[in-house]
């Protein structure tokens, strides 16, 4: 899992201030960090089906948040995508 220091770093990088944990950009960045962690975990533990299900759930959650963010603020969406390196 992502530890507390990594979460604080993500929040300070993508949030408006240090305590801005609820904005869409921060939520997407945190979910992306969890997805990266679970992807590495599943490379080692191929038969961990519950983690795979959790990963798919997170991917769907991130997809819906990205769709919302794209409709709400296109410029911020494009900046977030480039910072996270999600789409090529």
UniProtKB/Swiss-Prot annotation:
Pfam families associated with the record: Ribosomal_S15
Keyword Ribonucleoprotein found: yes
GO molecular function: rRNA binding; structural constituent of ribosome
GO cellular component, one term: cytosolic small ribosomal subunit
One GO term (biological process): translation
SMART domains: Ribosomal_S15
Function summary: One of the primary rRNA binding proteins, it binds directly to 16S rRNA where it helps nucleate assembly of the platform of the 30S subunit by binding and bridging several RNA helices of the 16S rRNA.
Subunit structure and binding partners: Part of the 30S ribosomal subunit. Forms a bridge to the 50S subunit in the 70S ribosome, contacting the 23S rRNA.
Protein name per the record: Small ribosomal subunit protein uS15
